[in-house]
Amino acid sequence: MTENHYLLLTPGPLTTTKTVKEVMLYDWCTWDVEYNTMVQDVRAKLVSLATKEEEKYTTVLMQGSGTFSVEAVIGSVIPKNGKLLVCTNGAYGKRIVQMAEMLHIDVVVSQTEEWEPTNVVEVEKILQQDKEITHIAIVHCETTTGIINPIVDVCKLGKQYGKVTLVDAMSSFGGIEIDIAELQIDFLISSANKCIQGVPGFGFVIAKRDELLKCKGQARSLSLDLYDQWETMENQNGKWRFTSPTHVVHAFYQALLELEKEGGVKARYNRYDNNQKLLVNRMREIGFKPLVDEKYQSPIITSFIYPEEWFDFEQLYNELKRDGFVIYPGKISKVDTFRIGNIGDVHEADINRLVDSIAKGVVIG
């Protein structure tokens, strides 16, 4: 277990290593050449994680939570006469819809139940019927439940019908192998405090260069102007337009080095996947059932159904916190659930200790 007051079993912010925390003990200037060079290195490393066709893509770092980066994409990429199709089966897909509505972007929704993946057949029907759609957005890992959505099929469809593809990979990038060139993703969005195991403070967009260049002058916000942010970073050696989170960037750079040391995304995926399978197997032994079908389940976070009407999540939460663990409440409307994440600096021994603690506090007949 990492040295910490408790272990975060959440989808981010998450438990970070001691070495990631330690680099934040120092202060840096945003104009320093060494710092800006580090920003450029971070941008390049992210592209190399995302695809082998590195020359076709670029990275934009954006201050704020991951949602800021999603909104930067929605508000900058879609022109005034554009129309967005959003595939949603959870809170984060709904949030994209809300962004589009707030920004007065024409939006249509493909909705499935929260425990079911995006329906590719329905998506194609919508694309066939509505020729005005220009962009399609989907959440890869919907952390509302932990479900994985079929981005391969949806992006393939998007390109078949000539659409720009936007993927919210907030809780999957760095933990699940993705080649955005192979998948034909034009814009992929993620955040520092997810599978790369940094801390909160900025998100990032990995964009296809030729699509990003079309975004100039389209932004509906000054601070969330994706093109202007990129142009400044690109032309001024990693400079941010406005004050950047220097401590967070250094922590993220350290986290990237640690990802490489672990063996890259494939090795990290294997650790997360082993954590998740161990978690489910041990939770089943003490009477808890996962919400999502195994074939759609991500290695990121798992939703468990309340076992009985008498089950008291708040009591379990408080008991686990006293034992050094923090888990997540449920976030769906039709079924009572709670969620346990297994990303971050979390290992098999941590999962075993967690379930031992749950078993101690809950007796299920």
UniProtKB/Swiss-Prot annotation:
The modification N6-(pyridoxal phosphate)lysine is found at residue 194. Its EC number is 2.6.1.37. GO terms for biological process: organic phosphonate catabolic process. It is an enzyme of class 2 (transferase). Belongs to the class-V pyridoxal-phosphate-dependent aminotransferase family. PhnW subfamily. It catalyses: (2-aminoethyl)phosphonate + pyruvate = phosphonoacetaldehyde + L-alanine. SUPFAM superfamilies: PLP-dependent transferases. Its cofactor is pyridoxal 5'-phosphate. GO terms for molecular function: 2-aminoethylphosphonate-pyruvate transaminase activity. Homodimer. It holds the Pfam family Aminotran_5. Involved in phosphonate degradation. Keywords: Aminotransferase, Pyridoxal phosphate, Pyruvate, Transferase. It comes from the Bacteria. The keyword Transferase applies. This is 2-aminoethylphosphonate--pyruvate transaminase.
